[in-house]
Amino acid sequence: MPCYSINLPAWACKLGSILAKISGTTCHGCYALKNRYIMPIQQAAMIRRLKALTHGSWTAAMITLITGHKYFRWHDSGDLQGPDHLKNIIEVCKATPDAKHWLPTREHKLLQFLDPDIIPKNLLIRVSATKVNGPAPSWWPWTSTVSTTTKTCPAPDQGGKCLDCRACWSRHTPNVVYAQH
C-alpha cells in the first residue's frame, strides 16, 4: 500500500460479515479474518478504532493524521458502519483537499440514495461487487470486482504492492478487477 490507511475489525462489517460465511462471495475467505489481522495487539487496536468512530473528535483527529499526505485508503479491513461514519469521512475529505482518498465499500445501502456529484473530488468511493466473477454494480460510477480468470490490478505481479499504480484512487478507472486471493 503506497499510503496510510485505517482498518476496523472485519467481523464488524455489516454486509461483509454475512458474505464471509457464503461460498462464492468476495468476502468468503476474507484475508482480514484469516492471517492478516489476527494478532491480539492488532485486534485490540481495531476495536479501539471502531469504538472511536462515535467520539466527538474523531473527524478532527483524522484530519490531523491525514493532513500532509498525498494518498489515503479507508478500510483495508472493515467497512462503513453507518450513515454518520460516511458523513464524517466526507467531512475529513473536504478538510484534506490535498490528499486523494479511496473508500472501497460493500455497504451499497448507504450509497444508493447518495448523488455521486456531491462527493468531494478528492474522494473516490468504489463500490465492490459481492460475488466472485460477478458483475460490478451498474448504478454507481466507480466499482471493483473480483475474478478468478483476469485482473487489472497489477499488485499480484509486483510482490503484492501498488508501486506507481493509483487506479483505485482514479475517477478515470470505472472498474478495478482484482485477482481472487
Where are these regions (language model features)?
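Class I S-adenosyl-L-methionine
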Residues: 1-181
